[in-house]
Structure formats: structure tokens, C-alpha cells
Swiss-Prot record:
Pathway membership: Protein modification; protein glycosylation
The name this protein goes by in its record: Dolichyl-diphosphooligosaccharide--protein glycosyltransferase subunit 1
Organism this protein belongs to: Canis lupus familiaris (Dog)
Lineage: Eukaryota, Metazoa, Chordata, Craniata, Vertebrata
Gene: RPN1
Subunit structure: Component of the oligosaccharyltransferase (OST) complex. OST exists in two different complex forms which contain common core subunits RPN1, RPN2, OST48, OST4, DAD1 and TMEM258, either STT3A or STT3B as catalytic subunits, and form-specific accessory subunits. STT3A complex assembly occurs through the formation of 3 subcomplexes. Subcomplex 1 contains RPN1 and TMEM258, subcomplex 2 contains the STT3A-specific subunits STT3A, DC2/OSTC, and KCP2 as well as the core subunit OST4, and subcomplex 3 contains RPN2, DAD1, and OST48.
Positions bearing N6-acetyllysine: 187, 538
Lumenal side: 25-434
Post-translational modification: Ubiquitinated by the ECS(ASB11) complex.
Length: 607
């Protein structure tokens, strides 16, 4: 699909940005968190922490402007960080996300990040930012095993305070739970509880790097569904199609099922297996077609497909409900039109597709492998990713009519959530002449096949020769030629009969004489050829030679009768013979002639 030059150049300028960690500058001015409002969302199996921070530059004799600020992760949670995003408050567009670089601070362990401000902060100025973090596998089931009829409870441990390298003047924290059934929670600062909410604070004058364990034990029956491993294969064809296939390994990472499973109780009691997973919805692109869903056994017919205006919604229902510790594996595939995702300008191509797509709500992917299969002959491959990914050496993929293989881009990433559903751009060059390669290969293959068959049928692969068989083949060939010549000779008689009839009508003697001459000439030639073939049969020692000789004699009699019919016709036309007498004579001649022809036919059948 041709696109405007400006649009393609914009795609070509997009670049993946994954810088190495750097050290924070010691001369950076010390900032202050004037006000922090934290929201900890624990309503699903993810921990989503959002902090609205009013960042101030107090000055304190320093005239240096603050072009960036530092973020720190809680030591207990940093290993399970899946997503970190920072925005200026009030600017929700994705383009307004601030640049975040991982950094290090001397004398401090843990993970730190430098966030670049859109406008440098002058002394005495303030800026409001929103820090969003998502953590996976930090909600631990407690108890770790439950029966089918029991509810699921989990424990979360975090920090009461906003963990920051800067001091905080005031801070509040609101915790959103999955239910109002809470077993226990920490009581720092006399928190208030309302339904499924816990409100802490305000806390005042909190020093930098402050920590105080926050712990809550509550009921959470939301789907603890985790994709332990996923392989996403994208195969690009310049003939108008992009094939996508996803191999998914699923596991219920909640409390492990203890004891037996009763399907009767599961279907009879609505609250039986309340923490189990019956089904979930996958969102496919709106242009998806030829969708299939199968597992190791085969096609799964319990799935449902709903086509919407902006997407295709697929309800995936495994063959059995998933309880804690249970696993399943399935494959989803579909086709997409390439004109919606593939752009080109001359030999320059840009593929823009999602690195990972929606599998289910609140998704967690422990390990993702993405393989992008480009057309054979693609070169100068470059990958632009919106976040850091790991690349493996490119591979080669062979399929129908490939000669030297299709290049395959292999990329990996661990610990992904919904925020990672973003586009990846692959640039490459491709000579359009190579599109003729496969059709030409098909033509060449058929040409070679037919040529081989022609040569094969003409070759003699017998180890020893059979003289008798060869003789039979020669006799059969000669006999076939004799049959052809005899039929031609009989055709001459019929043609001469027509000549006699025309003569009787026109009374033109020249017509009859010309017919006689033609009959004699052609009959003589055919009879001579038959005699030659008769000699060859005699040479081969075939008893068919006698039958051909007998047929020659019968034919001579037929010829005499044919010529006699011509004489009778001349006498009739000249008035030397009455019509009644001519008719009777003609009947006698025709009868004898028919007997002779019948005998000839019997001989031909015997041949």
C-alpha cells in the first residue's frame, strides 16, 4: 500500500530507546514532595500503585534549575515491577509520557529512575506529576491451599509511605480491595475503613527513604490467571495477508485446589469454585478473519466469536474450569489484511503491529517470545520498539516454494501487562522483482515434471528383451495399419456409389469417367500398401497373413461388382436397359456385394 512520503518518513524516524543505566548527577538540586496522594489498587491479582506528587523546588540558596527528578522503587517490590509510567498531571495523552531512564545512586542499593521534566523547574516552582507502577505476583494466597467450596484470601505487603529519595511534607494513601471481607490490616495512623476501601493519613514530614510495612489480608476471588509462556508468530506476505498465531500456556496462580474436584457441586452451587476461571475474553483486531481456537486435542467448539465495530471479541472457554495450580494450553490464530499494517515507499517497507495484544483483562505474561517472519529476500532489517526488548539472532524459516529461507526476527520480554500493548515498527527493504520468484518456481516445476514424464515413457527399462513380445507388438502395429487401409478402401466404394447416383441424374459421362479413374488410382495404391503389409506379416510368421490374403480376394470381387453397377447405369442412361430390369439387376448386385462386405468385416474382427 502506498502512503504519503511524510508519513513513511515519520515511521522511518521512529526508534527504539533502551539506554543503559546511568549515574545521577550529585550536583542536582534537592527537591521536596510537597503533597503525595497514593492509590493502591488491589482489586485484581495485580498491584497498581498510582501516586499524584506535587514536586517543589525549594531553592535554599541554589539557583540551579531542576531538569529532572529521581524516583525510587520499594525494595520489597522492585523485583516484580512490570510497568512504570510518569505523566504531568492533566495531560493524559500517550505522547505526553515523560522520559524515564534507569539510574544509580552512590551508596544506595535498589532501583532508581531519572525522570526528565518537560520544562526545567526554577527555584520556588512546583509541578504535579502522576507516577503509575504495576507489580505482578505480589499478592500471595493465604492460605496457600483451599477446597472447592472455600473462598480465596490473599496477603499484600508494601510500604505505608511513598518511598522516595526526597522528603515528603504530607501524604495520604487509599487502598482499594477486591471485597469488604478483610481479615486484618495494619493500623498505622488510625486508618478509616469504608466497604472495600482503606484510607491512611495524612502523614506529615516524612524523611527520604522512609519505610514502614503495610500489610493487608483480605478476600480476593478475582481471576488469578497468568500466562506462564506465550509465543506470538507474525508471518508477513506481500500477497496481501498477515498470519498471526499465538501459542499460550495458562496457569491459575491463586490458592492451590485442595482435595477432589466435584463437577456436580460446581454446576449446582453458584459459589462453588468462586475463585476458579470458567472463561475469559480475548480482543482481536477488527480486521481479523479466519479465526481458529484449538488445543492439543483439536478444535475447541465451546468458544464464541462476536464481531464488533472496532474489534473482534472472542470468548475462550477451556475444556475444564481452572482452579489454583491448574494449567492449560491453547492456540489462537487469525489472518489480517496487510494493507492495514504494512506501508511501503519503493523498496522501503515498514510493518507496524502490536508487540503483544490483548489476551484477557488484567493480563500478566511471565515470558513472551515474538517471531516476525518477513518475506524471503527482505534485507536491512531494523526494529523500533516502544520499550526495551531482548533480541536473539535472526533465524531462517522455510515454507512452500522457499529457496534460501525467510528471515525471522526473534524478540523476548518478561513480565508484561496491559500497558505493554503497544506498536512495534519493523523496517526492511525488499526488491519487488522477487515476488515473481514463487510463480516462476511453480512453472519450472511443472515443466520439469512433464519433461520427465515424456522422457520416462520413451525409455525401455527392461533388463532382457522378449523377442516374442516384440514380434506381437510388430504384428499388432501392422494389423492396425491394415485395418485403417481397408476402411479407406471401403470408403472409396461408397464415394463411387455417390458418383453413379449423380451420373444417373445429370447424364454427364465425364462425371462417371472421372469417378472411375479416381477409384482405380486410389484403389490400386491402397491395395498395393495392403499387399506390402501382408508381406511384412508373412515375414513375421503371423497366421494373419492368410486372412489378409483372403480379404484381398474378397475385395477384388467387391470391386468387380462396383464397376458392374457403373456399367448397368450406363446402359440405363443410354436406353439400352429398361428401368425395371435395371432395378432387379441392381438388387442382385447389391446383395452379392453386401455378402462380400460382411465376410470382410468378419475377417477384420478376427484381426
Amino acid at each position: 500500500m502506498e502512503v504519503p512520503t511524510a508519513r513513511l518518513l515519520l515511521l522511518l524516524l521512529l526508534g527504539a530507546w533502551a539506554p543503559a543505566p546511568e549515574s545521577a548527577s550529585p550536583e542536582a538540586p534537592l527537591l521536596v514532595n510537597e503533597d503525595v496522594k497514593r492509590t493502591v489498587d488491589l482489586s485484581s491479582h495485580l498491584a497498581k500503585v498510582t501516586a499524584e506528587v506535587v514536586l517543589a523546588h525549594p531553592g535554599g540558596g541554589s539557583t540551579a534549575r531542576a531538569a529532572s527528578f529521581l524516583l525510587a522503587l520499594e525494595p520489597e517490590l522492585e523485583a516484580r515491577l512490570a510497568h512504570l509510567g510518569v505523566q504531568v498531571k492533566g495531560e493524559d495523552e500517550e505522547e505526553n509520557n515523560l522520559e524515564v531512564r534507569e539510574t544509580k545512586i552512590k551508596g544506595k542499593s535498589g532501583r532508581f529512575f531519572t525522570v526528565k521534566l518537560p520544562v526545567a523547574l526554577d527555584p520556588g516552582a512546583k509541578v504535579s506529576v502522576v507516577v503509575e507502577t504495576v507489580y505482578t505476583h505480589v499478592l500471595q494466597p493465604y492460605p496457600t491451599q483451599i477446597t472447592q467450596s472455600e473462598k480465596q484470601f490473599v496477603v499484600f505487603e508494601g510500604n505505608h509511605y511513598f518511598y522516595s529519595p526526597y522528603p515528603t511534607k504530607t501524604q495520604t494513601m487509599r487502598v482499594k480491595l477486591a471485597s469488604r471481607n478483610v481479615e486484618s490490616y495494619t493500623k498505622l495512623g488510625n486508618p478509616t475503613r469504608s466497604e472495600d476501601l482503606l484510607d491512611y493519613g495524612p502523614f506529615r514530614d516524612i524523611p527520604a527513604y522512609s519505610q514502614d510495612t503495610f500489610k493487608v489480608h483480605y478476600e480476593n476471588n478475582s481471576p488469578f490467571l497468568t500466562i506462564t509462556s506465550m509465543t506470538r508468530v507474525i508471518e508477513v506476505s506481500h500477497w496481501g495477508n498477515i498470519a498471526v498465531e499465538e501459542n499460550v500456556d495458562l496457569k491459575h496462580t491463586g490458592a492451590v485446589l485442595k482435595g477432589p474436584f466435584s463437577r456436580y457441586d460446581y454446576q449446582r452451587q453458584p459459589d462453588s469454585g468462586i475463585a476458579s476461571i470458567r472463561s475469559f475474553k480475548t480482543i482481536l483486531p477488527a480486521a481479523a478473519q479466519d479465526v481458529y481456537y484449538r488445543d492439543e486435542i483439536g478444535n475447541v467448539s465451546t468458544s464464541h466469536l462476536l464481531i464488533l465495530d472496532d474489534s473482534v471479541e472472542m470468548e475462550i472457554r477451556p475444556r475444564f474450569p481452572l482452579f489454583g495450580g491448574w494449567k492449560t494450553h491453547y492456540i489462537v490464530g487469525y489472518n489480517l489484511p496487510s494493507y492495514e499494517y504494512l506501508y511501503n515507499l519503493g523498496d522501503q517497507y515498514a510493518l507496524k503491529m502490536r508487540f503483544v495484544d490483548h489476551v484477557f483483562d488484567e493480563q500478566v505474561i511471565d515470558s513472551l517470545t515474538v517471531k516476525i517472519i518477513l518475506p524471503e529476500g527482505a534485507k536491512n532489517i531494523q526494529v523500533d520498539s516502544p520499550y526495551e526488548i531482548s533480541r536473539a539472532p535472526d533465524e531462517l524459516h522455510y515454507t512452500y516454494l522457499d529457496t534460501f529461507g525467510r528471515p525471522v526476527i526473534v524478540a523476548y520480554k518478561k513480565n508484561l501487562v496491559e500497558q505493554h500493548i503497544q506498536d512495534i515498527v519493523v523496517h526492511y527493504t525488499f526488491n519487488k522483482v522477487l515476488m515473481l520468484q514463487e510463480p516462476l518456481l511453480v512453472v519450472a516445476a511443472f515443466y520439469i515434471l512433464f519433461f520427465t514424464v515424456i522422457i520416462y515413457v520413451r525409455l525401455d527399462f527392461s533388463i532382457t528383451k522378449d523377442p516374442a513380445a516384440e514380434a506381437r507388438m510388430k504384428v499388432a502395429c501392422i494389423t492396425e495399419q491394415v485395418l485403417t487401409l481397408v476402411n479407406k478402401r471401403i470408403g472409396l466404394y461408397r464415394h463411387f456409389d455417390e458418383t453413379i447416383n449423380r451420373y444417373k441424374q445429370s447424364r454427364d459421362v465425364s462425371t462417371l469417367n472421372s469417378g472411375k479413374k479416381s477409384l482405380e488410382t486410389e484403389h490400386k495404391a491402397l491395395t498395393s500398401e495392403i499387399a506390402s503389409l501382408q508381406s511384412r506379416l508373412k515375414t513375421e510368421g503371423s497366421d494373419l497373413c492368410d486372412k489378409v490374403s483372403e480379404m484381398q480376394k474378397l475385395d477384388a470381387q467387391v470391386k468387380e461388382l462396383v464397376l458392374k453397377s457403373a456399367v448397368e447405369a450406363e446402359r440405363l442412361v443410354a436406353g439400352k436397359l429398361k428401368k425395371d430390369t435395371y432395378i432387379e439387376n441392381e438388387k442382385l448386385i447389391s446383395g452379392k456385394r453386401q455378402e462380400l462386405v460382411t465376410k470382410i468385416d468378419h475377417i477384420l474382427d478376427a484381426l
